[in-house]
Every structure is written in C-alpha cells, then in structure tokens.
Amino acid sequence: MIQQMQMPEKLEVDEASYSNYYGKFIAQPLERGYGVTIGNAIRRVLLSSLPGTAITGIKIEGVLHEFSTIDGVKEDVPDIVLNLKQIRFRSISKRNAVVTLVLRGPKDFVAGDIVSPEGDFEVLNPEHHIATLNEDATLKIDVSVGRGRGYMPAEDNKPETMPIGYISVDSIFTPIRNVKYSVENTRVGQRTDYEKLSLEVETDGSIAPDEAVSMAGKIINDHVRLFSLFSPTQEEEVEEEVQQEDEEFENMRKLLMTRIEDLELSVRSHNCLRSAEIDTLGQLVSKREDELLGYKNFGKKSLAELKELLESKNLSFGMEVTKYRLNQ
C-alpha cells in the first residue's frame, strides 16, 4: 500500500516580527525535498512577477540626452536618473501618469515633490534626495510613472512615439526588496526527516508581505494547475465526451435533414408546408410560429399538429440550425 504524502498543516506567520515591510512565514511539515522546491519557486515569482509602480521615463527642458549637465543643478543627468529610479510608489488608480514639475532654487529636490494632481499614486519615500538646485536654477521636468512587473530595462521602456529629449529609465517595478528562505528538518511522530520551510519577505511598503506571498502562490497555482489536466483518466474522459458530442451532432444533423414527405402528418399540413416551400425538418424548425401563421391557408390546427410533432423529437420552432451545415 502506497503511503499518503505528508502535506503542510498550515502556513504560520511570525506575528512578533510582522510589519508592512517584513513578514516571516513557516510551512510544515513537508516531504523531503519539497522545502527547496516550494521555497525557490515562491522566491523567484516574488522577485520577478509581482506588479508594481515605478518611473519609466523623464523629459527635462533644455536637455537633449541623458549625459547632459544642467545649469545651477549640482547633480548631472545620470545622477538624477539614478536617484529617480530609487523612488518607491504605491499605485492608487492602477493607471499610468505623467507629472510636470517646475522647481526653482535654492531647493533640495526630493521624491515628495512628485505629486499626482489626479491622486494616481503615493510616494513611499518622500524624503529621498534627487537633486540640489542653487539660487539661479530652474528645473522643468516631466516624470512618467507607469505600471509593470519585475524589472524593465530602459531600452524596453521606450514609448512608440518618443519626443526629442525623452529619457527612458530602467524601471524596478517589483515591490519586493528581498526574499530569503531556509529549510530545516522537523519531526512528525517518530520520523525526523520531514522539512520545515521558513520564508522571509521584505517589501517596499506598497504591498503587505502576506498579500505578496498570497499573490505569488496564486501565480504558481495558475501555472501548475494546467499540468494536472493531462492525467490518463481525464484524457479518456475528455475523449469520450468529444466522441459523444460528435455522435449527438451527427444524429441531430440527420434528423434535421428528414424530408417533410417522410413525416406522419395530415394532408392539410403537408399541403401547407409544400406551398410554403418547406421541404425538410431543418427548414421547419428554423421558422417562428408567427412566420408559419403568415403563410396562406396555414391555420392554428396545422401549427398545433406540427408543434406536437417537434416536441416528440425534442425540437422546437425558432431553432438556430446553420451549424449543422444542412445544405452540404
């Protein structure tokens, strides 16, 4: 008899250390080898596949390329771009936005100066330094903020129509700062070779750690679930279902191709259908009751007779029959 696999009983959260930025999660007991398998999969998905918000590009008035300097600004453009990449956002509207800023010195340009008039996002590190302007400096800058997953290099971040002076930025969309996992042995009964998985998740505060883990688990589950559809039993069931549907289709097609003259109908009903140029059962069921009553000499008695006939064959008036290709 095959022993049933040991499944983890629950996912525990270390409440003492939990915050909006950090969470430690423990799953046990796991079969040997599953700690690394699950831990590594969740770690990779957390770092690469969760959605987030980041700056995707900028345009600075008077600057034509990313290697320029700006009069009255201490930092050059590469330094400004580097500082902008480190700003963390929480998306509110889940849509892209462009913010235009006009800054005059003397001033310390910080992340908190980037405010969406429409309330599309919130800056999570508003004190983060971007640039220093002296008393003569004026800086006009358009900041594009967008949504994405994981990491997007600048060359893949370029819009289809890029205005002169637009500078694409490497975008770090992922809300995950770091993920670590460790695997230890744990006891179940007399056996000590089961595993305990400890997963530590650090976020930028735009998403709670437990929400991030839940999202990663769903992404993995959605992918892995597809592979469970190909068991031999399910394949046989699907094949039988398809064969049954094909059989039903052909039986219905043959029934609808039945000639009216082969049906047991009164002479009056036969004559009415012949004068209406209705030759097959398929042509009959495609008609509505009011259409039939509009034909010459077609009365309610004939309609009642035909309705009873159709019901005996599990048919009805007004059916859609084009899919049965009755003209072929």
UniProtKB/Swiss-Prot annotation:
- Which reactions does this protein catalyse? RNA(n) + a ribonucleoside 5'-triphosphate = RNA(n+1) + diphosphate
- Provide this UniProt record's keywords sorted from A to Z: DNA-directed RNA polymerase, Nucleotidyltransferase, Transcription, Transferase
The segments labelled Alpha N-terminal domain (alpha-NTD) in the record are 1-231
InterPro entries of this UniProt entry?
A: DNA-dir_RNA_pol_insert, DNA-dir_RNA_pol_RpoA/D/Rpb3, DNA-dir_RpoA, RBP11-like, RNAP_asu_C, RNApol_insert_sf
Listed GO cellular component terms?
cytoplasm; DNA-directed RNA polymerase complex
Q: Does the keyword Transmembrane apply?
A: no
Picking any one GO biological process from the record gives: DNA-templated transcription
**EC number, UniProt record:** 2.7.7.6
What general EC class does the enzyme of this chain belong to?
transferase
- Where is the segment annotated Alpha C-terminal domain (alpha-CTD)? 252-328
Does the UniProt entry include the keyword Transferase?
yes
Query: What GO molecular functions are on record for this protein?
Result: DNA binding; DNA-directed RNA polymerase activity; protein dimerization activity
Please give the family membership noted in the entry: Belongs to the RNA polymerase alpha chain family.
Q: What does this protein do?
A: DNA-dependent RNA polymerase catalyzes the transcription of DNA into RNA using the four ribonucleoside triphosphates as substrates.
Domain writeup? The N-terminal domain is essential for RNAP assembly and basal transcription, whereas the C-terminal domain is involved in interaction with transcriptional regulators and with upstream promoter elements.
Please give the subunit comment from the record. Homodimer. The RNAP catalytic core consists of 2 alpha, 1 beta, 1 beta' and 1 omega subunit. When a sigma factor is associated with the core the holoenzyme is formed, which can initiate transcription.
Give the protein name, as stated in the record. DNA-directed RNA polymerase subunit alpha
- Name the gene: rpoA
